[in-house]
Amino acid sequence: MYHTPVLLKEMLDILSPQNGGIYVDATFGSGGYSRAILNSADCQVYAIDQDEYTYTFYEKLSNDFPNRIHFFINKFSKIQQILNNVQIKKVDGVVFDIGVSSMQLEDASRGFSFSKNGPLDMRMSTSLSGVDARMFVNTVSEVEMANVIYQYGGEKYSRKIARAIVNARNKNMINTTGELASIIRSVVSRSKNHSIDPATRTFQAIRIWVNKELEELEKGIACAANILNQGGKIIVISFHSLEDRIVKVIFKLLCDGKSVNLLNLGLGFQLINKKIIRPTAEEIHSNPRARSAKLRAILKL
């Protein structure tokens, strides 16, 4: 399963890769952004992904672009540390594509999908993080669970869902995505006016909690800002309002010259696009996953 990169043309237009440049693809996935960057200029790409399953895509890209793509299995919050270890101090651009990939959703064994039965896992990396979705649904208190589902999923029935999960686990441990989805659907019915599955928001919330995604995003952008050359760019494509809000706030802090995550960056930044860039109708038609994508970008002065 290949993950179709979203807003690819728009990302490339803004990044504008140059010969001799050094770029970071902070969310490598199946390598769509990395391939496009490498095709655009005679440059180097340092690619990061915490999902060890993405290594096979790196191998293919490495054969196509020998000595120009460098791959690291790690969290993108470690960008600075990763690059320091290979004596790279500054880069010309960092690209983030936030959230779960099509490959992860399609693989039932990863436990991300409510439409495919599999073990309750949801970890982006099975080697880097220990807490999984099964632990969340079977051990977290009802109050904390309801708060997570509400805050990270925007689910108005969060209390009802949390109560149903706790009632179910008191009888039998919840082990699969199918069991969890059935519990949620038993207390929340599908809206007549909306095609969204009742389990969608809860699964999103649990995934964000398991992977500490919002905390990772804050750290990742702050580290990226710290390693940019003058004229360097950070581009973030996000898929839901929580992520986009974090990007918007951090970019504003950077433009206002405020410190981010205890990093006092000194140099100024400016927004590249004042308004969010969204996919065209044509892209949404050919790749429905793109419909909620938002792109924000910032330039180091």
UniProtKB/Swiss-Prot annotation:
GO biological process, one term: rRNA base methylation
HAMAP family assigned to the protein according to its UniProt record, in alphabetical order: 16SrRNA_methyltr_H (MF_01007)
Function: Specifically methylates the N4 position of cytidine in position 1402 (C1402) of 16S rRNA.
One Gene Ontology cellular component: cytoplasm
Binding site for S-adenosyl-L-methionine: G31, G32, Y33, D49, F76, D97, Q104
Name of the top EC class for this enzyme: transferase
Native organism: Ehrlichia ruminantium (strain Welgevonden)
Protein name listed in UniProt: Ribosomal RNA small subunit methyltransferase H
SUPFAM superfamilies: Putative methyltransferase TM0872, insert domain, S-adenosyl-L-methionine-dependent methyltransferases
Family: Belongs to the methyltransferase superfamily. RsmH family.
Taxonomic lineage of the native organism: Bacteria, Pseudomonadati, Pseudomonadota, Alphaproteobacteria, Rickettsiales
Pfam families tied to this protein: Methyltransf_5
Gene from which this protein is expressed: rsmH
